UniProtKB/Swiss-Prot annotation:
This is Pentatricopeptide repeat-containing protein At4g16470. Belongs to the PPR family. PCMP-E subfamily. The lineage of its organism: Eukaryota, Viridiplantae, Streptophyta, Embryophyta, Tracheophyta. GO terms for molecular function: RNA binding. It comes from the Eukaryota.
Amino acid sequence: MKTLISSSLSHKSQCLTICFKLNKLAMVYYTREFQTEASQTSASGSMFSGNATTILRRMLAEKRIGRFQVENQRKTEKLDKTLKGLCVTGRLKEAVGLLWSSGLQVEPETYAVLLQECKQRKEYTKGKRIHAQMFVVGFALNEYLKVKLLILYALSGDLQTAGILFRSLKIRDLIPWNAMISGYVQKGLEQEGLFIYYDMRQNRIVPDQYTFASVFRACSALDRLEHGKRAHAVMIKRCIKSNIIVDSALVDMYFKCSSFSDGHRVFDQLSTRNVITWTSLISGYGYHGKVSEVLKCFEKMKEEGCRPNPVTFLVVLTACNHGGLVDKGWEHFYSMKRDYGIEPEGQHYAAMVDTLGRAGRLQEAYEFVMKSPCKEHPPVWGSLLGACRIHGNVKLLELAATKFLELDPTNGGNYVVFANGYASCGLREAASKVRRKMENAGVKKDPGYSQIELQGEVHRFMKDDTSHRLSEKIYKKVHEMTSFFMDIDYYPDGLDSSCPV
């Protein structure tokens, strides 16, 4: 081989041929030998031999790169199959871990399968990890995967990231619009959800049944009857096919907006009635304290052969509570397991405790709690605590409050209920101690808010809130009214600073 190289260097026209031969051999040893021999001959000063060496090195490098790419391609194909297999067998955690440890990009279809699995299992954190892996390995998102991620972020409540993905879409069809509307409504930002709905309509996107399910829920929460009727009219005009979810949301919307006749008429016109739509009707009457209507509808539901579910029974028990119907409450409570095989849960026990408490049967309520399998359920003790506060039973109040705080020590509302219970019984010092204990524990109560609708716009207010654009004028008016009441020596009930929170 050395002889071949040396003789070849004397013929510059054959240098390129030698390069190809060496490339075919793919041996770094001969490449270095070629350079050494060339430097010792007359060709060492020739630019041609230098170029030949450069070409040779480049060709060898390309060969290595090609081999690396082929190897990587094989790894990726194997990884794709493995990840899909893990998803099919429900091993999502292993799939995400393997994806990260590989440090490789996979096919868009594989990413889509992983994200879909995260969505179905409500493993939103794992979905975000997959998105982070895409970013780390430099994967360029296509429009389909952007929509997949948008839906995942919207479901998880991360509307900021969902909004960024939404705005980055080149084409916004109905699916991303629905995801954004639903995301805002589920997070309790119904007003913003309606804004997006109207923005979608201005962009000439035709809504579907999923759109209206979210819009009707938003109108229910905001008590926006006119907006709900307008959406219902669009649904009828566009001949949008309904489903059980939309039907129940529509019935619920009319009842929540105090339009009983419209709500019942929609229910009567339904082609299919099931436990969900029946429960919406019963719940609608219960929401407004129509106890007799709740019980009538419940009986009619059973007559038509529709079996109630735990939610239906909870609505009925709550109605019995509001109506002070203790015996009826017991009847339906025992009927759950006896007639329908439904095991009462914590909320059902809490409803019965509340019913007994309203009737002043506190000792019976306490004994019922102690015998129940849900005595470790905080709302059960919360119901007893509320009843003790109303009837001024300090002994049971302290017992219920102690257990309540023990089960849920981080809930600021529990401390407030306890303190208010002491205050209602005239024990101001004890109430102050509870508030100090709450402060020392670093526990805060989530602020409540009030809202009103003026000229089609909903305005929300919280304590010490200055975020409203007319805050200065609002507070000025409040001070004027306060001064006026003081001038005429009028003090509303509960204005004393030591009153319950």
